[in-house]
């Protein structure tokens, strides 16, 4: 069930990226992947090293053309379907991991989210949990091999690591520079408002009294910081942990748009539950195992496969050890006062980190108490300004917040991060795509208009484009009854000054053409 669920997550993640890849990192996208590869390649060539080791991906070979990007997404979807139906599961998972690693490492800021890294870590671990026979059928699970058993322990550790550090960072990363919203119990009073893409249910949750928000932290910390230790207390401890983790993720699903992350976390809970504990009908319909040992790969001696997997799992253990020591030491309120990671381990982790075999996690380490939003506007005359309305982004105050997960509209997410910066900054990681977006809107680019729900300039591009920073708040129930609006907003100030189109060449007085 775990592998089948992972195949579904891969399919969702790749499909979600595919429908926007050209607009974001295609040849004419906001941040072309080809430029990223060119930049990294030149920098590393100057150091006498291939850029592959900084950004391992297939597009060093094929080039990051639109055709190559779309072909990778198409192949990834096909391989995910093979995993779901139980055919060539091992090779398909290996191909999926390579393809998604390539997409992440060429996606720039649009692919820099913790769940993308979590999917890669999960996908890498799945290579040691799956069977590599070519043919499969529905049946009861066979006995686990030694490699499977070790990998299963790693799977238990992964979900425990994810959940524990999600709770621990909320407490350990509070400092004078980062107010103690979590430790003082006020974080949930503004979480529903300030999350990147709110939902209409978040509006309702935001209206609840402060005591409720503070009380809701108790079960959250119980699930995130206590239940991870239940993983070591036998199958019933793992069963309790699985239901606790899954229950928390379902509650988050009901109030937020956190892409496929919640579903991936639920899938990660499946190895905690023994297959025999599932109803027989469900087990027979959702599990797959190999048929006999007829495929060529199945004839490989178990000893050989264990010999190949052993060093990889040892390396995985070392990287996880490095991450644990680093995270427990580097927090403002560290658990470890000294860095206990030896230099050779730091070097090893640095070499393999671009492949994301293991990572540290910690969602909502810091919180924002207000909701700034960037409002892009265009004008034909410099006096009358009309606002652009972007798909899934908070713009119109009258529009009800919607559910979009498990799809991730990544431009809408990046707008949220850019707004937190307060003002356009050329040194920011968001500067490149934002500048490109403004110029494309100014020039009336047809492709970029696919990001829009409403284009105020359908016939001719504006002469000027600007960006203002707004502060959005949820309306109160009384305000919504009176106005019908879900939001209210005020102007904070300028985010980006007016950007104009170059003046068209004018003819010389003597009619001799442009001067």
What spans do the regions from the language model cover?
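Alpha-helical membrane-anchoring segments
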Residues: 1-515
């Amino acid at each position: 069930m775990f592998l089948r669920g992972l195949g579904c997550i891969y399919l969702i993640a790749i499909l979600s990226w595919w429908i926007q890849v050209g607009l974001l990192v295609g040849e004419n996208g906001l941040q072309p992947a080809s430029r990223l590869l060119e930049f990294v390649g030149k920098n590393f060539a100057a150091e006498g090293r291939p850029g592959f080791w900084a950004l391992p991906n297939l597009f060093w070979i094929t080039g990051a053309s639109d055709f190559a990007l779309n072909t990778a997404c198409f192949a990834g979807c096909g391989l995910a379907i093979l995993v779901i139906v139980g055919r060539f599961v091992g090779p398909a998972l290996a191909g999926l991991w390579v393809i998604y690693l390539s997409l992440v490492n060429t996606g720039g800021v649009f692919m820099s989210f913790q769940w993308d890294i979590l999917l890669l870590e999960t996908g890498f671990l799945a290579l040691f949990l799956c069977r590599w026979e070519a043919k499969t059928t529905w049946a009861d699970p066979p006995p686990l091999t030694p490699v499977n058993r070790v990998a299963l322990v790693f799977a238990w550790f992964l979900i425990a690591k994810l959940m524990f550090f999600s709770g621990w960072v909320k407490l350990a990363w509070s400092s004078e520079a980062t107010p103690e919203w979590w430790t003082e119990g006020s974080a949930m009073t503004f979480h529903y408002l300030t999350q990147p893409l709110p939902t209409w249910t978040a509006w309702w949750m935001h209206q609840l009294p402060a005591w409720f928000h503070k009380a809701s932290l108790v079960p959250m910390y119980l699930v995130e910081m206590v239940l991870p230790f239940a993983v070591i207390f036998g199958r019933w401890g793992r069963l309790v942990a699985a239901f606790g983790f899954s229950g928390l993720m379902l509650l988050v699903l009901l109030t937020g748009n956190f892409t496929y992350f919640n579903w991936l976390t639920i899938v990660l809970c499946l190895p905690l539950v023994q297959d025999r504990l599932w109803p027989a009908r469900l087990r027979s319909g959702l599990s797959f195992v190999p048929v006999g040992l007829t495929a060529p790969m199945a004839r490989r001696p178990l000893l050989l496969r264990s010999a190949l997997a052993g060093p990889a799992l040892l390396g995985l253990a070392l990287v996880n050890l490095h991450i644990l020591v680093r995270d427990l030491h580097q927090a403002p309120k560290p658990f470890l006062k000294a860095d206990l990671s030896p230099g050779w381990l730091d070097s090893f982790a640095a070499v393999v980190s671009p492949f994301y075999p293991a990572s540290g996690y910690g969602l909502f380490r810091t919180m924002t108490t207000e909701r700034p939003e960037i409002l892009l506007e265009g004008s034909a005359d410099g006096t009358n300004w009309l606002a652009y309305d972007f798909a899934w982004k908070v713009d119109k105050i009258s529009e009800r917040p919607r559910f979009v997960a498990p799809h991730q509209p990544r431009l809408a997410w990046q707008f949220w991060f850019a707004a937190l910066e307060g003002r356009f900054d050329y040194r920011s990681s968001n500067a490149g795509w934002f500048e490109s977006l403004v110029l494309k809107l100014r020039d009336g680019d047809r492709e970029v208009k696919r990001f829009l729900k409403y284009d105020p300039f359908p016939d001719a591009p504006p002469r000027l484009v600007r960006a203002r920073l707004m502060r959005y708040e949820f309306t109160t129930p009384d305000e919504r009854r009176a106005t019908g609006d879900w939001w209210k907003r005020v102007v904070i100030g300028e985010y980006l000054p007016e950007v104009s189109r170059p003046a068209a060449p004018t003819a010389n007085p003597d009619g001799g053409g442009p001067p």
